[in-house]
C-alpha cells in the first residue's frame, strides 16, 4: 500500500503526482487489474506463451 504525506506548502497536485508515481513504481494498480477476475491456469499459460512468442518476433 502506498502512502503519501502532503508536505508543508505543497500543492495537492504535486502530492497527487508523487502518489501516482509511487503506485506505478510498486505495480499496485497493474496487480489489481490482473487479479480483478479469476483466470483459469490454462488461460494463464496460453497468455504467457503468446507473450513469449511476441517477444521472440
UniProtKB/Swiss-Prot annotation:
**What is the top-level taxon of the source organism?**
Bacteria
Gene3D superfamilies on file: Ribosomal protein S8
A GO CC term?
A: ribonucleoprotein complex
Q: In its UniProt record, which GO terms are filed under biological process? A: translation
Instruction: Give GO MF terms, alphabetically.
Output: structural constituent of ribosome
Query: What are the alphabetically sorted keywords of the record?
Result: Ribonucleoprotein, Ribosomal protein
Q: Give the Pfam families listed for this entry.
A: Ribosomal_S21 (PF01165)
UniProt xrefs under NCBIfam families: S21p
Concerning its family, UniProt says:
Belongs to the bacterial ribosomal protein bS21 family.
The protein's name in its UniProt record: Small ribosomal subunit protein bS21
Organism of origin is Bacillus cytotoxicus (strain DSM 22905 / CIP 110041 / 391-98 / NVH 391-98)
Taxon lineage = Bacteria, Bacillati, Bacillota, Bacilli, Bacillales
